[in-house]
Curated annotation (Swiss-Prot):
Family the entry assigns: Belongs to the class-II aminoacyl-tRNA synthetase family.
Oligomer status and interactors: Homodimer.
One GO MF term attached to the UniProt entry: ATP binding
Protein name, UniProt field: Lysine--tRNA ligase 1
Taxonomic path: Bacteria, Bacillati, Actinomycetota, Actinomycetes, Mycobacteriales
Gene: lysS1
Cofactor(s) required for function per UniProt: Mg(2+)
Species this chain originates from: Mycobacterium tuberculosis (strain ATCC 25618 / H37Rv)
């Protein structure tokens, strides 16, 4: 609120509440005290008195605090429902014979819906059997100048995203998703640590943006006078850890990609990457499946995931595995191999009605591998529903991945799809520094041809490989997308505070 805002510019409710704030200050009653002597949360009061008989008084004296979400004032007795941060609600009663006329009148005059209040008094059960705190004193802990949304009018999705703090107050579903995310992250760390993985931290600011095919956010260090990039993946530094002697490592942190935002993509998101020595992509697929199943057990309590439409999504047991080229061949009705030409692939795309698709007909250096993945996504990928690993990708699109042991032209890579969402990826990691340099050179040629997602050559990473990296497998999984898979929600609903375009004013 700027000094230029006059009373006439403000909504009526805002003006009324601001006037109440001013009156409280004039009376020497701070509407924003430094602290209040809360002794119990609302949940603790409820847990201590689960079956209190109707119209019963106890000698349990408590100090509670919460946000007023309902209030009813009468002559000598006022009722209010307080809500705690976890959504627990508890009734408080302000009675003339307990607090006196002045305190009762002050409650009626000063307290609005949305205010946070402190109430001290005895735990009782009302005549209707409602567990309550009968106040002997009270005070405002934080005056709300903005009224809460009308209870019977649901907030729009845009409003929920822009004002998540209000969404958390008024919508139990928002609180549940926020707490589920916390439980999921905790369960991931526990499951990995139980398997002997060590959590490490690698740079977020990097001199080169490597480890993934994505456009980075660029910035500049004034102290060093060099350009830097927000990381698009932690992969290359985690592999340096493997070179340095770590056996199993993981990082769960934020990554940034300067690309589109939609129902499954966000420019800033949480990524889990894991690396373990002496394993292959088959081993990491098993670990990933077990990890997700254990997270569901711990955070949700079931592997039969309840979805918003009332259906159930089953992630128990073994998951399906398909190969990219054979599954694409079946979908197209003709054999597609690593030797299929670019012209033929574009001809197939035209026959599917994709002749104007910019991802198919482009001038950015996309070749066989990119076209294979685009065609697969538009045919096989869009039909996947059950948990599925798709394996063995084109060499051209997987420059950090080991060549397949028995199939020429493909690499040992899998992608995991849950509920049709691309959730995770895993490799048998490329450890030959000579081949890795050749792959980086191929990426440089693609970049020169216009591919702005091509990887850059990282000489320090190559130097690390030249010291010798043991055989290893790595995985990457988006935490936001994992929440999407577990809940059926959009990516913006799974992120506590997603990026939104500022209002024009």
């Amino acid at each position: 609120m700027s000094a230029a805002d006059t009373a006439e510019d403000l909504p009526e409710q805002f003006r009324i509440r601001r006037d109440k704030r001013a009156r409280l200050l004039a009376q020497g009653r701070d509407p924003y005290p430094v602290a209040v002597p809360r002794t119990h949360t609302l949940a603790e009061v409820r847990a201590a008195h689960p079956d209190l008989p109707i119209d019963t008084a106890t000698e349990d004296i408590v100090g509670v605090a919460g946000r007023v979400i309902f209030a009813r004032n009468s002559g000598k007795l006022c009722f209010a429902t307080l809500q705690d941060g976890d959504g627990t609600q508890l009734q408080v009663m302000i009675s003339l014979d307990k607090v006196g006329q002045a305190a009762l009148d002050a409650w009626k005059a000063d307290v609005d819906l949305g205010d946070i209040v402190y109430v001290h008094g005895a735990v009782i059960s009302s005549r209707r059997g409602e567990l309550s705190v009968l106040a002997d004193c009270w005070r405002i802990a934080a005056k709300s100048l903005r009224p809460l949304p009308v209870a019977h009018k649901e907030m729009s999705e845009e409003s929920r995203v822009r004002q998540r703090y209000v969404d958390l107050i008024v919508r139990p579903e928002a609180r549940a998703v926020a707490r589920l995310r916390i439980a999921v992250v905790r369960a991931i760390r526990t499951a990995l640590q139980r398997r002997g993985f060590l959590e490490v931290e690698t740079p977020v600011l990097q001199t080169l943006a490597g480890g993934a095919a994505a456009r980075p956010f660029a910035t500049h260090s004034n102290a060093l006078d060099i350009d830097l990039y927000l990381r698009i993946a932690p992969e290359l530094f985690l592999k340096r850890c493997i070179v340095g002697g770590f056996d199993k490592v993981f990082e769960l942190n934020r990554v940034f990609r300067n690309e589109g935002a939609d129902s499954t993509h966000s420019p800033e998101f949480s990524m889990l990457e894991t690396y373990q020595t002496y394993g292959t992509y088959d081993d990491s697929a098993v670990v990933t499946r077990e990890l997700i199943q254990e997270v569901a057990d711990e955070a949700i309590g079931t592997r039969q995931l309840p979805l918003p439409d009332g259906s159930v999504y089953d992630i128990d047991g073994e998951w399906a595995t398909i190969q990219m080229y054979p599954s694409l061949s079946v979908a197209l009705g003709e054999e597609i191999t690593p030797q299929t030409t670019v012209d033929r692939l574009r001809g197939i795309a035209d026959s599917l009605g994709l002749e104007k698709d910019p991802a198919i007909h482009d001038n950015r250096g996309f070749g066989h591998g990119k076209l294979i993945e685009e065609l697969w996504e538009r045919t096989v990928g869009k039909s996947l529903s059950a948990p599925t690993f798709v394996k063995d990708f084109p060499v051209q699109t997987t420059p950090l991945t080991r060549q397949h042991r028995s199939i020429p032209g493909v690499t040992e890579k899998w992608d995991l799809y849950l509920r049709g969402i691309e959730l995770a990826t895993g490799y048998s990691e490329l450890s030959d520094p000579v081949v890795q340099r050749e792959r980086f050179a191929d990426q440089a040629r693609a970049a020169a041809a216009g591919d702005d997602e091509a990887m850059v050559l990282d000489e320090d990473f190559l130097a690390a490989l030249e010291y010798g990296m043991p055989p290893c497998t790595g995985t990457g999984m988006g935490i936001d997308r994992l929440l999407m898979s577990l809940t059926g929600l959009s990516i913006r609903e799974t992120v506590l505070f997603p990026i939104v375009r500022p209002h024009s004013n």
